[in-house]
From Swiss-Prot:
Interactions between auxin response factors (ARFs) and Aux/IAA proteins occur through their C-terminal dimerization domains III and IV. CDD domains: B3_DNA. One of its GO terms (molecular function) is DNA binding. Belongs to the ARF family. It comes from Arabidopsis thaliana (Mouse-ear cress). Homodimers and heterodimers. Residues 545-557 have a biased composition (Polar residues). One of its GO terms (cellular component) is nucleus. This is Auxin response factor 16. InterPro entries: ARF_dom, ARF_plant, B3_DNA-bd, DNA-bd_pseudobarrel_sf, PB1-like. GO terms for biological process: auxin-activated signaling pathway; cell division; pattern specification process; response to auxin; root cap development.
Length: 670
């Protein structure tokens, strides 16, 4: 049992056993450990009030860094609903240390020395909740939670004593009977149902405490379905430190909240508006304060583990990102995961909380019928699905999934027919308290997240169908033009053709001139395959592929395209020697299943045998005939098998090597 002093009332209140509290709260609830650091969100706290919260002109920040001083686990005297009181003390922003945990806390936000106590929850059926009926006990619960039953008796029967959240003891008769035989609670069950006002859909929780006592608790059902109704499932921290839960808001409630500056929790909240204002006032003054959290009734958690919030806000969120999110079912019997796409990134209440990350993400669900009212979520409650790409951008996508446009006018038509999006920027990067953290993230890591597939969330088959069936485009413009909102820059130096890059907020720089021109669209290379020819033009130079960069120059007009991925750096930091961005004698090596290649210096090798040994060492592949599994692309774009020409010629022309993972993979694109 936990007894925590309550300075606000000047007395001692009896707390509930934390293990029984968590069993009643549900499997998705995670409380922050003692001495851990959390962010307190007054905006979220206001949503838990049962009347309007008017902060007036108080200079309340959107989030306050705090340390957890005390946690008190309690239960409502009337409904048995569990809740917790947290005592927090504000900290200065400079007191935050990354990867810092509280005493006894592991990286997942739990107390590392705690062991899970066996418990079992069952959703009551109509028969279980009937007045005068009995309770059908699942076999697992009867054999693992209940005291051992003597099956040699006829009939096997026992009296069990169960202690509820208030310490009251309930007596039940447990019998094993029927055809087929089953475990039942008979005498004493009807009285328990009537006293606790249980209905079908509520859950009964049995737990065996560490001291051997049998405990019983209640988990009231959420009315209205998954993500619906006034009561939403909420969790303090992600399970396993990687995923989060439902901090949800209906679209109509969100609009009314912004219009009236009132809490959406009218007639649904559990705390008073005065207590919310008092807590926020104490927080901004740097004094300790207390908040109350109802895990089964609150719309969302408003004290978030600092590490989770920081990690979520380091991500440069943008529309099109794919994620998954966990929800507790209506009867709280299981946890289900749902896939979704970020549709927009903007502040939920720009007037009162202009810099708040609270409900920053507008989302669209793959199963909208089940989650039709869930329009906004907090970024720390979702898990990015980084290994699921709506558009496969690997270097070895099958040829049937590549789109090649043979004529130059078609390319202009393509650019002209695709609506150019305005890439949403993270509104918190410069204006929020998290900006200092975001500034420390390497630019290369930020840019790596901005892939074309993340903006659109389309599969390659969808795009292929679109291009085959799209209506005829308007006549092509005289020159290729892209929206300035993409940050496209043109640099022409005398008669030399420059580079074309999409800049994502990087510092402009003077790029080394190249004799070859290229274009990069949405961060991916467009590789022409045919020579551009215009009437009266004498320029017949081939346009070759070059590296991806975060900054550069632009050249209009190409013939075809090919999507590929690259991990090359900015041209500001290295000299470009040829169309591939590599010095002569260097090439990129890719495994068939990988997106990112490695740079190999061929000039230090003297034969194909040395090349075979080098590749085996680089990728840990032991093949007796390595060269038979290696394809390469030369400077002219031709694809050949390694070993078909003298090594000296191979050394001069090889620009890209691909190691086939299976023999006979002839459909691989190099």
């Amino acid at each position: 049992m936990i007894n925590v002093m309550n300075p606000m009332k000047g007395g001692t209140e009896k707390g509930l056993d934390p293990q029984l509290w968590h069993a009643c709260a549900g499997g998705m609830v995670r409380m922050p450990p003692m001495n851990s650091k959390v962010f307190y969100f007054p905006q979220g706290h206001a949503e838990n009030a049962y009347d309007c919260v008017d902060f007036g002109n108080l200079p309340i920040p959107p989030m306050v860094l705090c340390r957890v001083l005390a946690i008190k686990y309690m239960a409502d005297a009337e409904s048995d609903e569990v809740f917790a009181k947290l005592r927090l003390i504000p900290l200065k922003d400079d007191e935050y240390v990354d990867h810092e945990y509280g005493d006894g806390e592991d990286s997942n936000g739990f107390e590392s020395n705690s062991e899970k106590t066996p418990s079992f929850a069952k959703t009551l059926t109509q028969s279980d909740a009937n007045n005068g009926g009995g309770f059908s006990v699942p076999r697992y619960c009867a054999e693992t939670i209940f005291p051992r039953l003597d099956y040699n008796a006829e009939p096997p029967v026992q009296t069990i004593l169960a202690k509820d959240v208030h310490g009251d003891v309930w007596k039940f008769r447990h019998i094993y009977r029927g055809t087929p035989r089953r475990h039942l609670l008979t005498t004493g069950w009807s009285n328990f149902v009537n006293q606790k006002k249980l209905v079908a859909g509520d859950s009964i929780v049995f737990m065996r405490a560490e001291n051997g006592d049998l405990c019983v608790g209640i988990r009231r059902a959420k009315r209205g379905g998954i993500g619906n109704g006034p009561e939403y499932s909420a969790g303090w921290n992600p399970i396993g430190g990687s995923c989060g839960y439902s901090s949800l808001l209906r679209e109509d409630e969100s609009n009314s909240l912004r219009r009236s500056n009132c809490s959406l929790a009218d007639r649904k909240g559990k705390v008073t508006a005065e207590s919310v204002i008092e807590a926020a006032t104490l927080a901004i003054s740097g004094r300790p304060f207390e908040v109350v959290y109802y895990p089964r009734a609150s719309t969302s958690e408003f004290c978030v583990k600092a590490l989770d919030a920081r990690a979520a806000m380091r991500i440069p969120w943008c529309s099109g990102m794919r994620f998954k999110m966990a929800f507790e079912t209506e009867d709280s019997s299981r946890i289900s995961w749902f896939m979704g796409t970020v549709s927009a990134v903007n502040v939920s209440d720009p007037i009162r909380w202009p810099n708040s990350p609270w409900r920053l993400l507008q989302v669209a669900w793959d199963e909208p019928d089940l989650l039709q009212n869930v329009k906004r979520v907090n970024p720390w409650l979702v898990e990015l699905v980084s290994n699921v790409h709506p558009i496969p951008l690997t270097s070895f996508s099958p040829p049937r999934k590549k789109m090649r446009l043979p004529q130059h006018p078609d390319y202009n038509n393509l650019i002209n027919s695709i609506p150019v999006p305005s890439f949403p920027s993270n509104p918190l990067i410069r204006s929020s308290p998290l900006s200092s953290v975001l500034d420390n993230v390497p630019v290369g890591l930020q840019g790596a997240r901005h892939n074309a597939h993340q903006y659109y969330g389309l599969s390659s088959s969808d795009l292929h169908h679109y291009y085959l069936n799209r209506p005829p485009p308007p006549p092509p413009p005289s020159s290729l033009q892209l929206s300035p909102s993409l940050g496209l820059r043109n640099i022409d130096t005398k008669n030399e053709k420059g580079f074309c890059f999409l800049t994502m907020g990087t510092t402009p720089c003077n790029d080394t001139k190249s004799k070859k021109s290229h274009i990069v669209l949405f961060g991916k290379l467009i590789l022409p395959e045919e020579q551009l020819s215009e009437k009266g033009s004498t320029d017949t130079a081939n346009i070759e592929k070059t590296q991806i960069s975060s900054g550069g120059s632009n050249q209009n007009g190409v013939a075809g395209r090919e999507f590929s991925s690259s991990d090359e750096g900015s041209p500001c930091s290295k000299k470009v020697h040829d169309a591939s961005g590599l010095e002569t004698g260097h090439c990129k090596v890719f495994m068939e299943s990988d997106d990112v290649g490695r740079t190999l210096d061929l000039s230090v090798l003297g034969s194909y045998e040395e090349l075979s040994r080098k590749l085996s060492d680089m990728f840990g592949i032991k093949k007796s005939e390595m060269l038979s599994s290696v394809l390469y692309r030369d400077a002219s774009g031709a694809i050949k098998y390694a070993g078909n020409e003298p090594f000296s010629e191979f050394l001069k022309t090889a620009r890209r090597l691909t190691i086939l993972t299976e023999q006979g993979s002839e459909s691989v694109v190099v």
